[in-house]
Amino acid sequence: MEGLLYNSWDIINLYIMNEKATFFGHPIGLRTLFLTEMWERMSYYGMRGIMVLFMTAGVSGINPGLNFSAAEANAIYGAYIGLVYFMVVPGGWLADNIFGHQKAVLAGALIITLGHFTLAIPITQTFFLGLLFIILGTGLLKGNISTIVGRLYENNDSMRDSGYTIFYMSINIGSVLGFLICGGLGEKLGWHWGFGAAGFGMAIGAYQ
């Protein structure tokens, strides 16, 4: 996995060193970043879409959950979202001072994948462990992948703004895919199938 992913990052480095392959007229590295972000957002929003439903579903029946009250589920959901965005700060510091941005994104993608697959294990005790992995991984990936997009362009390059526009389109596409795929599987086959689909999506993103 690491070798495949580093081949993609090598494409980014080659463009930075003025290899002029393009993606819709933009640096070819934007393709790798676009697809990685798209699948990460698919996994993130797909899991979010079924998270509260899983927590509030009863422990018995054809699609059992954790049987939390609505208040408990909403509190956990809110804490999770808050921690995801808070961890971008230490994730950025680690990338700037220790790992570098590319290694931070790689590590984040792998940790997020582990988190979703941990959620997919049909054991109640793995739920919070899976959330912890996703929080940590997203902190490493989320802010740093945007930084790499900026590195594809010179400071005064007029294409930079449109490059970011293309990149941010991946968020919208990924969120729609997440709600359709993870939400559909979660409600029709079982919540853990939805979590597993999120993990599979992030695994695809890690291979870009």
Question: Model regions: which residues?
Answer:
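Intracellular juxtamembrane helix-capping segments at the cytosolic ends
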Residues: 141-154
